[in-house]
């Protein structure tokens, strides 16, 4: 039985430094206190390319060195946009008590009895090295652009999945030999498993993902440590386990579940792990379908306890009501939160077009469709349209000028004598009469 700590998706950067350094420092302390034989970081140690003088680089290096002073460390190449190729090379040079091995190619790595690493010359060992404590099969991020250039962009996703499945099956024989010799076998990779869940609860059910649980189990490793997906989740088969550690901290609003690292115990035929939570920041979402209700916000603030939390208020409302939201009052109610983020979604005013008008071929047919939808008379418009299509501007102007003017008869005024008579009759009736 061998014990190891599995960290993943740390994402050190300037913007994330406070959150991830607090969580990773805590995780390193916990791993050392609990006693581990090795540490694995399964990709995305950084969030993007970093300058060597950046505080995030110093903070990450400090914690990696602390780990290396306690046990051997394996760092896997993650997503290229987060860890550009070569980013991890500097960690090979930290010079701790134990070496840091950077797995940036397809390979197998043996953890020897003295706490050193021995990497295979090619993608796998032909014969298991002597004196192993554990055998790691490493599958770093695959460069999809290289695959697309070789097989075509439309076939790249399927080709990657097929080739990785063949590769993983290729590890099975050497892993079986190692298990028979009482050696723990461990897989480490960075990618997406078909059917896994994102940190926001969305299933990844597309056909362009690198792995399936079947292909990962086919490698014959007792434990398979994964990175890339920020939600902790696992699959089990006959005592063997596949698991995402999830991200070390909470980097976005709406992320579900605890954040932490996995503490593994791995034997030859079975494995187990515990999720050790880190002090990730607490996020709260307050969502309204319409106008934000200040009373509901106050109630939520009292019931959930917003002190020190990161609070996001979201609402959806018509465009004409957008100025009715009292943002300052919302911020005042939530003033004990560490951060308040207000996100209003405005529904724009939509003017409906006549149904089916875009499907008509001619302008005349479009006019008829519009007239039918609006219950208007279409004949005058069609007559004008015909004139525009068949006559010159001069002819149209001439027709307008020569049109006969319909004579209108003016209403004759009522003589003054008749008005006086009507007034006298009204007085006699003692009822008001409207004069015109």
Predicted feature residues:
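Catalytic metal-binding/acid-base residues of hydrolase active sites
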Residues: 11-13, 45-46, 79-81, 107, ...
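Binuclear metal-dependent phosphoesterase catalytic core
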Residues: 108-132, 240-314
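Extreme N-terminal starter segment of soluble prokaryotic enzymes
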Residues: 1-5
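Conserved beta-sheet core of the metallophosphoesterase superfamily
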Residues: 95-98, 193-267
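Conserved catalytic scaffold of divalent metal-dependent phosphoesterases
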Residues: 90-209
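Accessory, non-catalytic peripheral segments of nucleic-acid enzymes
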Residues: 266-436
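Core catalytic region of metal-dependent phosphoesterases/phosphodiesterases
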Residues: 16-116, 213, 217-221, 229
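Divalent metal-coordination and catalytic microenvironments
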Residues: 9, 24, 39, 44, ...
């Amino acid at each position: 039985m061998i014990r190891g700590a599995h960290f993943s998706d740390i994402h050190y950067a300037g913007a994330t430094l406070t959150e991830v350094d607090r969580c990773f420092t805590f995780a390193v302390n916990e791993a050392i206190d609990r006693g581990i034989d090795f540490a694995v970081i399964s990709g995305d140690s950084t969030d993007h390319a970093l300058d060597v003088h950046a505080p995030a680089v110093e903070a990450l290096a400090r914690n990696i060195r602390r780990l290396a002073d306690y046990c051997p460390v394996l760092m896997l190449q993650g997503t290229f946009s987060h860890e550009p190729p070569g980013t991890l090379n500097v960690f090979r040079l930290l010079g701790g008590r134990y070496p840091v091995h950077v797995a940036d190619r397809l390979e197998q790595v043996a953890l020897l009895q003295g706490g050193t690493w021995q990497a295979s010359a090619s993608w796998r060992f032909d014969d298991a090295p002597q004196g192993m404590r554990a055998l790691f099969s490493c599958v770093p991020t695959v460069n999809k652009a290289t695959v697309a250039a070789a097989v075509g962009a439309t076939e790249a996703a399927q080709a990657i999945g097929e080739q990785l499945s063949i590769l993983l099956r290729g590890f099975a024989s050497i892993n079986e030999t190692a298990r028979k010799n009482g050696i723990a076998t461990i897989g480490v990779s960075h990618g997406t498993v078909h059917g896994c869940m994102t940190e926001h609860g969305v299933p990844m059910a597309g056909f362009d993902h690198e792995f399936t649980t079947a292909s990962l189990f086919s490698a014959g490793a007792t434990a398979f440590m994964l990175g890339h997906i920020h939600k902790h989740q696992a699959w089990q088969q006959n005592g063997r386990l596949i698991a995402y550690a999830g991200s070390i901290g909470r980097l976005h609003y709406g992320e579900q579940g605890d954040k932490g690292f996995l503490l593994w115990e791995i034997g030859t035929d079975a494995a187990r792990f515990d999720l050790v939570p880190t002090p990730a920041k607490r996020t709260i979402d307050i969502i309204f379908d319409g106008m934000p209700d200040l009373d509901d916000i106050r109630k939520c603030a009292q019931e959930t306890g917003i002190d020190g939390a990161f609070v996001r208020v979201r609402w959806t409302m018509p465009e004409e009501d957008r100025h009715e939201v009292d943002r300052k009052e919302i911020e005042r109610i939530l003033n004990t939160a560490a951060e308040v983020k207000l996100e209003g979604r405005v529904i724009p005013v939509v003017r409906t077009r006549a149904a089916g008008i875009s499907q008509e071929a001619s302008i005349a047919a479009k006019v008829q469709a519009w007239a039918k939808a609006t219950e208007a008379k279409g004949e005058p418009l069609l007559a004008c349209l015909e004139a525009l299509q068949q006559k010159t501007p001069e002819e149209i102007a001439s027709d307008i000028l020569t049109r006969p003017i319909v004579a209108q008869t003016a209403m004759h005024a009522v003589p003054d004598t008749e008005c006086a008579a009507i007034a006298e009759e009204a007085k006699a009736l003692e009822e008001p009469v409207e004069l015109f």
